């Protein structure tokens, strides 16, 4: 057509690719427009998503750690396995088990401070002796204020609420025949253990209680015949003084680590804790020690004309 420009369009300018980028640049008026190239652009997108995901995971891990975490594993053992292990330790003394720990390469491990002692002893039948499987609980001092002056009804409501919400006994369902309740506590004058609850624990099969702190109603506990190993009497109630922190987690009692499922042996010499994973080996060494001791003392009894007692039978 007359006046029409029939010249071919100018060739499109080739765009230089920037090193390290997967897109091309084009000049379009005053704006910069980016065009994604297939593989490189997808990789960049995926990398950005991965970075976001990694940051999210890191934030979640940080939040979980700040909320508290136990790093020591707590294996769960069946009641049948507990009974099998307890038979291996039946009749063994703390001295025998201590020697067994030495022979197993566990010298100075598991021996609680000697100030954790039996509340009472039976020198004839040795009913104060304990061989059991650890169930653990940890009580900590409270940061909340005490009740203050109240009338009896108001105080009882406050006390019941504290027992229910803050200082309960959630370990009770875990107690079964052969259990030893081991309590970590730091109160100086609080009777977390008393003549009532210790009997209820015994009813569930608990064969004894070990505490790093105190107990009250000690005269009644002696009369009841429940083995108790502790530091000294404490007189106050738990409300206003302590709170339950954990149940069946690793604790420290008498200066030693106690894990749920460990074997606890206690007598007039104190308390020793055997790691569950080494229990069979330690029991075998300890049994040999006991048999040798009984044989030697039996001969001495006979030479001295002493009547046999339960320690050599």
Name every feature range the model reports, one short phrase each:
Residues 5-6, 15:
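Short terminal hydrophobic/aromatic SLiMs and anchors at protein ends
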Residues 21-23, 34:
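Aromatic (phenylalanine/tyrosine) cluster motif
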Residues 37-48:
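Bacterial N-terminal signal peptides
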Residues 52-54:
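Boundary at the C-terminal end of the N-terminal hydrophobic targeting segment
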Residues 57-171, 180, 301-305:
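Intrinsically disordered, low-complexity regions enriched in acidic/Ser/Thr/Pro/Gln residues
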Residues 108-110, 133-136, 146, 179-182, ...:
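Structural motif
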Residues 163-164, 169-212:
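Extracellular/luminal Protease-associated
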Residues 231-309:
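Acidic, glycine-rich flexible loop/linker segments
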